[in-house]
Regions:
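Gly/Trp-centered helix-boundary motif
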Residues: 1-238, 242, 391, 395, ...
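Alpha-helical transmembrane segments of integral membrane proteins
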Residues: 34, 44, 167-170, 177, ...
């Protein structure tokens, strides 16, 4: 196989490296580690962090791309498939390759729509055909309930065995987590819930379509897991674009004041006066026109979809920095009047050194709180933009495209509800975990909130 590094792959690896570096810096500085210990002592924060790490792990696995090798021809030269795959695709191959003809309900053994079937005696009747893969191992369909129960119990047993293999050594050596008992309990219970769910899915997914299939017969569970990367990337990469603009302009406006402050205020006031959805839609349509007129820029469809996703992150970042910039401007106006900042200016310390050593450390809590609180909003923004047709590439799997595809399915009779339900369930868990973690981070890092409580 030939490794492939897309633009968003490199950026997500950069973000992971930055997160690891941030953890190392925090552990080496007591004044930085103290508030994060308060976060780690909160059971809700620990549980939410474990869920977010699980989603992030899936996104990273889906960012390790490659092009599979084709059988060697007569020339002996290595040939590679034009389709770009990921490590997650390789892991999900047992369910990705099990494609049916069209819709089927969760755990169904027959298609959702009737078709003309020719019987053994030559008669043609309209009935629900048997699925090729869903329950295809069953000789008698009446055994389905017992088979699902048996496989679910095996999956639960496997998940519990893995959990015990992790928990018992850590508990015996008392190194589970250097925080309170409540956080330890939340950590291990959350890991247990994730492992039990994973065990059940591993046991059932190769034999049944757990969340059914869509219009083209694709397994909805596979599409939902592949959509996680898009949601995580939208939230993470947009933040990567937002932070430099918000920090640079917001802190500069508050510290220097005068004309700099006037220009920055005029800039974000003008941006806020433009309806956000219209501004984003106009920018996306311009970008889409540019990509369609230059198809020679891309070797594969995955590269084209990836570049569109990257541009969408850039557009969202350049239109969402105003709120954080306004908060940083207000906080910097207060910090610049503190005694140690005034003393530094009196001793001739340069403005750049004052900003780096005195101002930025005192506004970092606002940055961190804003980052974690905006993440969930950006995930929802992708769903809304894809729903109105100006989101990610239609061929890319995402929660927004799944919801957009389910819109017409809800209007048919009988209703095809499972694609919308699957996208809603996974997006709900991701956004809820992000919101709960953001609330805990805000409570731990905001000094005003701690004093008032």
């Amino acid at each position: 196989m030939m490794p492939v590094v897309l633009w968003t792959d490199g950026l997500i690896f950069l973000l992971v490296a930055g997160l690891v570096g941030f953890v190392v810096v925090v552990r080496r500085n007591e004044h930085l580690a103290a508030p994060w210990r308060r976060v780690a002592a909160d059971p809700v924060a620990v549980a939410a962090a474990v869920v977010l790490l699980c989603f992030t792990g899936i996104a990273v696995l889906d960012s390790l791309h490659f092009r599979p090798a084709l059988p060697t021809g007569a020339s002996g030269e290595a040939q590679y498939a034009p389709e770009v795959k990921s490590l997650l695709d390789r892991l999900l191959a047992p369910i990705a390759e099990r494609q049916e003809k069209t819709y089927s309900a969760p755990f169904a053994t027959r298609l959702f729509a009737k078709e003309a079937i020719t019987l053994a005696d030559g008669r043609t009747v309209r009935d629900y055909p048997r699925l090729k893969y869903g329950g295809g191992h069953l000789a008698d369909e009446s055994e389905r309930a017992g088979d699902i129960l048996q496989r679910s119990l095996l999956g639960l047993a496997g998940g519990l065995a893995v959990w015990l293999a992790l928990f018992l050594p850590a508990h015996a050596k008392r190194r589970a987590f250097p925080v309170g008992e409540g956080s330890k309990r939340a950590l291990w219970l959350t890991v247990l819930a994730i492992l039990l769910t994973t065990g059940v899915l591993i046991a059932l997914a190769p034999h049944y379509h757990v969340f059914g299939t869509d219009k083209v017969g694709q397994d909805v569970l596979y599409a939902t897991l592949k959509s996680i990367r898009t949601g995580v990337l939208i939230g993470a990469l947009t933040t990567l674009v937002t932070l430099p603009l918000a920090i640079g302009l917001g802190v500069s406006a508050g510290y220097f004041g005068g004309r700099v402050d006037d220009v920055v205020q005029y800039l974000y006031t003008t941006l806020n006066a433009i309806p956000g959805v219209l501004l984003i839609a106009a920018a996306v349509l311009l970008m889409q026109t540019q990509l369609e007129t230059h198809p020679d820029w891309f070797e594969t469809g995955a590269e084209r979809a990836d570049l569109r996703l990257l541009f969408l992150c850039l557009i969202l970042g350049m239109t969402n920095w105003t709120g954080l910039a306004r908060l940083l401007r207000g906080e910097t106006l207060k910090v610049r009047e503190l005694d140690y900042v005034v003393a530094a200016r009196a001793f001739g310390v340069s403005n750049g050194r004052i900003l780096l050593r005195h101002v930025l450390p005192n506004v970092q809590h606002i940055v961190l709180i804003s980052v974690v609180m905006d993440f969930s909003g950006l995930v929802l923004a992708e769903a809304v933009l894809s729903y109105v047709g100006v989101g990610v590439d239609p061929g890319m799997l995402s929660f927004g495209n799944m919801i957009n595809g389910a819109r017409l399915e809800l209007a048919r009779e009988p209703v095809v509800w499972w694609q919308l339900a699957a996208a809603f369930l996974f997006m709900f868990v991701l956004v809820l975990a992000a919101n709960l973690f953001a609330d805990c981070v805000r409570d731990a890092l905001d000094p005003r909130g701690r004093r008032s409580s």
